[in-house]
Amino acid sequence: MSIKSRIRTIPHYPHEGIMFRDITTLLKDPAGLRSTIDGIVQRYQTEKIDKVVGIESRGFIIAAPVAYALSAGFVPVRKQGKLPAETIGCDYQLEYGYDKVEIHVDAIDKGDRVLLIDDLIATGGTMEAAIKLVQEAGGEVIECCFVIDLPDIGGSRRLRQQGHRLFSLCSFED
């Protein structure tokens, strides 16, 4: 089954010149959703994964069922101020300015083997911040997983150059 063929492209959204990759068409298709989750689970089913970290917000949709299938815990990475208990945070650069993501201080145990999941990698800034949070909490990042890689934007290349393992189910090149 082609996951890529089930992803809708919306030109000039949210800004002129952007080709937005919309996974809602993949998620609404029962076979597409199953193929997405199963494809990720199959890759990691022989690994010992303690926690699956999902990045707000579309990463949650993929990460939670993967965590369930791998008998691992699920940890959300949220934007600043969205988690109710004590957090640790990491700033990351946007095109114009900065943003911050957080996890609860007790979300990752020292030595946890962690899989990070997001729907898409473009610049890699959010994933880089999530990696730093997991490491600061004492976790070991096993791999960063994405449904979509946009390699022309350079995020996957940058994270690989930093020594991180990455996996994506499909890629869209311009």
From Swiss-Prot:
It is an enzyme of class 2 (transferase). Keywords: Cytoplasm, Glycosyltransferase, Purine salvage, Transferase. It catalyses: AMP + diphosphate = 5-phospho-alpha-D-ribose 1-diphosphate + adenine. It comes from the Bacteria. CDD domains: PRTases_typeI (cd06223). SUPFAM superfamilies: PRTase-like. Pfam families: Pribosyltran. It is found in: Cytoplasm. One of its GO terms (biological process) is adenine salvage. Pathway: Purine metabolism; AMP biosynthesis via salvage pathway; AMP from adenine: step 1/1. Gene3D superfamilies: 3.40.50.2020. Its EC number is 2.4.2.7. One of its GO terms (molecular function) is adenine phosphoribosyltransferase activity. One of its GO terms (cellular component) is cytoplasm. Catalyzes a salvage reaction resulting in the formation of AMP, that is energically less costly than de novo synthesis. Homodimer. This is Adenine phosphoribosyltransferase. It comes from Nitrosomonas europaea (strain ATCC 19718 / CIP 103999 / KCTC 2705 / NBRC 14298). The gene is apt.
